[in-house]
Amino acid sequence: EISKGDQFSSGFVKANPNSKIPTLVDYTNDKPIHVFESGSILLYLAEKFNNFLPLENELKVECMNWLFWQMSSAPYLGGGFGHFYNYAPEKLEYPIDRFAMETKRQLDLLNKHLENKDFICGDQYTISDIAIWSWYGQLTLGKLYSAAEFLDVSSYKNVLRWAENINLRPAVKRGKIVNKVSGNPDFQLKERHSSDDFKKIKL
């Protein structure tokens, strides 16, 4: 548990020297493979299981473009806007306005890109959708920082449509409850070891 500092234990640091989550250790190989950073984990799993990654080179490059866009942009949303708007002990106007402006610029970019598209790479759901939805999708659905009204997310209609559609996916519903330790206990799955674990919860 990160609240107890488990990420600083020697076992965790061996898997991820940066002592952050998410971290993955794949034991299905002759030698365990340590994978850390969400983008790296998504790419590793997509290639390992040959899923959620386009096969065509042009679409694969497009997917990588947006995956790495999320990696570089999300800190402005989370560590920037999210921190000063939601977590900082003192509400400071300048950083809130500064990071809100950048977050809205990013949302506008996504909104334009998603026009006439079901997903980031067209009609195919990929790891770029998974990465971007986790932050920007949940933000537009009002699940992050209670900032939907402040950021006027309803004006980004293409992003909202995309976010709502992904939110309805059965795997997304399952994924949202894994390792969840707050909120309604009926929708928490603190550990997941097999697909049978989900049978205990009605989604």
Where are these regions (language model features)?
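Phosphate-coordinating loops and pocket residues in cytosolic domains that bind phosphorylated ligands
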Residues: 14, 168, 177
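Hydrophobic/aromatic-lined pockets within catalytic cores
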Residues: 46-50, 71, 115, 135-136, ...
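Acidic/histidine-enriched, glycine/proline-rich intrinsically disordered or flexible terminal extensions
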Residues: 179-203
